[in-house]
């Protein structure tokens, strides 16, 4: 009845001339070498995205020298962190109402971020605050300028940290914005000819997110022996990220265009699980064995989603990001409020689906 699958995206490694000659330690941040001590080492970290900003402030305390190689600066905003009082802890423990109020505050605070995302002209006010945050935390003005992105905030993933920028005030940390020319046995040479000796190279370069790439290692066969990677060759598409035409009984969580740039993905997953359970119940009650989204329903949905995405900061912010495929199509993000997604998926419309007595049954049967 139901195919459950998990696809592990691949680590993204930059390719640099001479990497195969390097004699030091090399690893990706997702495959951290915990048995390898960085204490007293000269370390190069490539990348300044969501992975890198988490470990850079921590390893800077232990290493002899840290070189942070930045291709593109990232917008980083303050982390809303505080200590909870004993009174608050007691209320959380005893009062369900108090927990619900707190959860609602967090939810609606995050949900409000949709407004500047869909109306990029409003984002400039938030961007001014982010620029002030950089200036406040980074002492050197020239360095602060290098750490300031040249695209509209929100075009790439907005990062959250109170520790990242202050790290560059340390004497043992150097921001390197020159491109890498070559990696030698014990050093890195940048395009300006400068050579920096290193003992360890860490890739904080993220992951491969385009399904057309990572599905090369995964086989899912649908109607007429079509593989999912073939069906998605021109860009991943589905119906609310849950079902894909020509693939009966293939239920997905966090499928195409249901990743978020503003709120908790758990909310989306909960909505999807509820919807999938309704689909399974619909099949069981019908006495059939398979269910499939009608092609015209999926096509209409995706046309609407792509139209909504065009005016967002993700598409019009002046950058390229993992949100988009190489051709610029945004296959990742949900373009509006999560409560709208919840409302749309709260109840299945049976008219949108084909009920079949077997997965291979033709539409006309």
Task: Describe the predicted segments one by one.
Residues 32-35, 171-191:
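A conserved short coil-to-beta-strand element within the FAD-binding core of flavoproteins
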Residues 70, 177-179, 200, 205-206, ...:
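Active-site proximal loops enriched in glycine and acidic residues that flank catalytic Cys/His/Asp
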Residues 267-270, 274-365:
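C-terminal active-site-capping segments
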């Amino acid at each position: 009845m139901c195919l459950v699958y998990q696809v592990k995206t691949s680590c993204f490694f930059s390719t640099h001339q001479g990497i195969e000659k390097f004699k030091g330690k090399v690893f990706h941040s997702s495959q951290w070498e915990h048995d390898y001590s960085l204490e007293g080492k000269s370390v190069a970290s490539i990348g300044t995205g969501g992975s890198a900003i988490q470990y850079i402030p921590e390893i800077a305390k232990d290493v002899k020298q840290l070189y942070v190689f930045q291709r593109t600066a990232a917008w980083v905003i303050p982390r809303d962190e505080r200590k909870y009082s004993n009174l608050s802890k007691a209320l959380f423990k005893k009062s369900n109402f108090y927990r619900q109020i707190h959860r609602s505050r967090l939810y609606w605070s995050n949900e409000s971020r949709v407004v500047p995302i869909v109306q990029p002209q409003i984002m400039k006010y938030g961007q001014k605050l982010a620029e002030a945050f950089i200036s406040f935390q980074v002492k050197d003005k020239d360095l602060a300028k290098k750490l300031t992105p040249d695209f509209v905030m929100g075009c790439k993933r907005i990062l959250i940290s109170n520790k990242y920028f202050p790290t560059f005030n340390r004497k043992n940390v150097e921001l390197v914005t020159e491109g890498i020319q070559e990696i030698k046995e014990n050093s890195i040479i940048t395009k300006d000819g400068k050579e920096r000796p290193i003992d360890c190279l860490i890739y904080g370069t993220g992951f491969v997110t385009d399904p057309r790439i990572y599905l090369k290692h995964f086989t899912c066969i649908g109607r007429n022996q079509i593989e999912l990677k073939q069906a998605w060759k021109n860009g991943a598409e589905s119906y609310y990220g849950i079902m894909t035409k020509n693939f009966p009984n293939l239920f997905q969580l966090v499928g195409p265009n249901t990743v978020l740039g503003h709120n908790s993905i758990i909310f989306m997953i909960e909505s999807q699980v509820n919807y999938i359970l309704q689909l399974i119940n619909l099949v069981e009650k019908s006495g059939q064995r398979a269910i499939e989204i009608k092609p015209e329903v999926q096509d209409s949905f995706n046309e609407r989603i792509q139209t909504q995405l065009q005016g967002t900061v993700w598409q019009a912010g002046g950058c390229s990001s993992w949100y988009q495929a190489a051709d610029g199509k945004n296959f990742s993000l949900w373009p509006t409020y999560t409560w709208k997604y919840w409302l749309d998926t709260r109840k299945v419309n049976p008219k949108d689906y084909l009920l079949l007595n077997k997965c291979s049954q033709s539409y006309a049967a």
